[in-house]
Amino acid sequence: WIMGHMVNAIYQIDEFVNLGANSIETDVSFDDSANPEYTYHGVPCDCRRWCKKWEYFNNFLKALRKATTPGDSKYHEKLVLVVFDLKTNSLYDHQAYDAGKKLAKNLLQHYWNNGNNGGRAYIVLSIPNLSHYKLITGFKETPKNEGHPELKEKVGFDFSGNDNIDQVAKAYKKAGVTGHVWQSDGITNCIASFIRGLDRAKEAVANRDSSNGFINKVYYWTVDKRATTREALDAEVDGIMTNDPDVIADVLNESAYKAKFRIATYDDNPWETFKK
């Protein structure tokens, strides 16, 4: 999965997919009542990027629905996965459940079209704080309560705080999650990737590939350089988040990687661990 980073303005959906992304990451900020409000990152953000692009969340969802609904004039067949980077650090821990519920209601109405030929992309909810695990509970209960239990098949989870992998496992246990797990690892592109290294990403990959691991997919962020792309591919991650999708696409075309990796399509289940 080539994951376009910080796609917060509607026009950027086309821009990133046209550069080679089959997945996008979108920031979601919340108001004081735990309602998702804007697709907005704010300052600071990655180097060489404008941090302040935004839309109202529901307007973005409607545009995203069009981009992922077959037959729509804005449809992109290859856009198959969307990561919502949930900026929940502005919320109190006790608001996490409500935030999940309200997020699900917004998606149900504006993205899934109340279960009537809505957008088809798989969704990853990326949560920065392990203590906000109840967001998952609130989110999962909502489609079920609204008569659309099938939509839970479209949703997976990620804790994005670079926490200890064992602690992440405990948070999922509390949330009752037993699958659909993506694990992110990384650092802003402003800091050279060699300073962080890939040790934790490799630890996540080892968990993914072990018989008793809880992780299904691993992605590394934010990668804009060819050398770092190669290192991440050598570590056998499933996804790379980038500001420059064309760079990742170029490296995937190199002879060393062409035979081993391919771009994921809608038929590739993002919740299944890839078996070599």
UniProtKB/Swiss-Prot annotation:
Q: What is its EC number?
A: 4.6.1.-
Record Pfam families: GDPD_2 (PF13653)
- Report the co-factor binding details: Binds 1 Mg(2+) ion per subunit.
Q: What class of enzyme is it?
A: lyase
The record ties this protein, via CDD domains, to: GDPD_like_SMaseD_PLD
Chemical reaction(s) catalysed: an N-(acyl)-sphingosylphosphocholine = an N-(acyl)-sphingosyl-1,3-cyclic phosphate + choline; an N-(acyl)-sphingosylphosphoethanolamine = an N-(acyl)-sphingosyl-1,3-cyclic phosphate + ethanolamine; a 1-acyl-sn-glycero-3-phosphocholine = a 1-acyl-sn-glycero-2,3-cyclic phosphate + choline; a 1-acyl-sn-glycero-3-phosphoethanolamine = a 1-acyl-sn-glycero-2,3-cyclic phosphate + ethanolamine
Subcellular location(s) per record: Secreted
Q: Which UniProt keywords apply?
A: Cytolysis, Dermonecrotic toxin, Disulfide bond, Glycoprotein, Hemolysis, Lipid degradation, Lipid metabolism, Lyase, Magnesium, Metal-binding, Secreted, Toxin
Task: Tell me the cofactors it needs.
Answer: Mg(2+)
Q: Name one GO molecular function term.
A: phosphoric diester hydrolase activity
Q: Which cysteines are joined by disulfide bonds?
A: 45-51, 47-190
Q: Which domain of life is it from?
A: Eukaryota
Q: Which GO terms describe its biological process?
A: killing of cells of another organism; lipid catabolic process
Entry keyword annotation includes Disulfide bond: yes
Enzyme active site: 5, 41 (nucleophile)
Q: Which family does it belong to?
A: Belongs to the arthropod phospholipase D family. Class II subfamily.
Q: What is this protein called?
A: Dermonecrotic toxin LsaSicTox-alphaIB2ii
